[in-house]
Regions:
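Conserved G/P- and acidic residue-centered "switch" motifs that form tight phosphate/ATP-binding loops
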Residues: 9, 13, 110, 169
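Residue-level marker of regulatory loop/turn positions in helix-turn-helix DNA-binding domains and
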Residues: 87, 109, 142
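Conserved SAM-binding loop
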Residues: 14, 87, 106, 166-167
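N-terminal helical cap/lid subdomain that shapes the substrate entry/recognition surface
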Residues: 2-10, 14-100
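N-terminal start-of-chain detector that recognizes signal peptides
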Residues: 27, 77-80, 106-109, 137-139, ...
Length: 209
């Protein structure tokens, strides 16, 4: 099948950010009274928004998840990203090739907040290749695992979702792409930041690399 567009997740696919974000979240949760390990934190939150686990956070910390708390988390997270973020090895070259082959019909469809996505793409030099086709689940009624962000990206490119390829590294993201009707390719280079090939295939990924 020849695809007319490719839709990329951002964190863990284009940029190596998951461990940085997880470290900041772990620090915040520990300071709030939840004695969770970094490994447990990653397992619970990878591929999800923090607010999607509001009930659990409030139960474990005994305090409300306020806008001020989220702002402090974002500040700590962004400080780490500005200092340490790098592109996934080979991602920049791959995106450049896809952009050339598809006449620019590529997009980012992320579950993260758009400010974070824009900052990360800019830092690793990918922003000009994707702009303005950068989409966040935070800006839509539902985020991943619902398909909204992928449907929005496909619509903006003028391509039917069934003619799109999606690249994802989490079960949540693969599920979103599959429900959107796209063909999903899983990325699983190993390590705790990425789902296993078996998990990605079980969620509906056609191939895993």
């Amino acid at each position: 099948m020849l695809f007319e567009a490719i839709l990329f997740d951002c964190d863990g696919v284009l940029v190596d950010s998951e461990h940085i974000t997880n470290r900041a979240l772990h620090t915040m949760l520990n300071a709030s009274g939840w004695a969770i390990s970094e490994a447990e934190c990653l397992q619970i939150f990878i591929g999800k928004t923090v607010r999607s686990e509001t009930a659990r956070i409030e139960r474990e910390t005994g305090q409300p998840l306020t806008d001020a708390w989220m702002a402090a988390f974002y500040a700590l997270r962004d400080q780490g990203l500005h200092a340490h973020l790098q592109a996934i090895p080979g991602a920049v070259a791959a995106v450049q090739q896809c952009h050339a082959l598809l006449g620019g019909k590529i997009a980012v469809a992320s579950g993260a907040d758009k400010a974070k996505v824009l900052m990360q793409l800019d830092k690793v030099g990918l922003l000009p290749l994707f702009d303005p086709h950068i989409f966040s689940g935070h800006d839509l009624p539902r985020t991943k695992p619902f398909p909204d962000v992928y449907l929005a990206a496909a619509a903006a490119l003028g391509v039917e979702p069934t003619r799109c390829a999606v690249v994802e590294d989490t079960v949540t993201g693969v599920t979103a792409g599959v429900v959107a009707g796209a063909t999903v390719f899983g990325y699983s280079p190993g390590g705790p930041e990425h789902a296993t090939p078996q998990a990605l295939r079980a969620a509906g990924a056609t191939q895993v690399f």
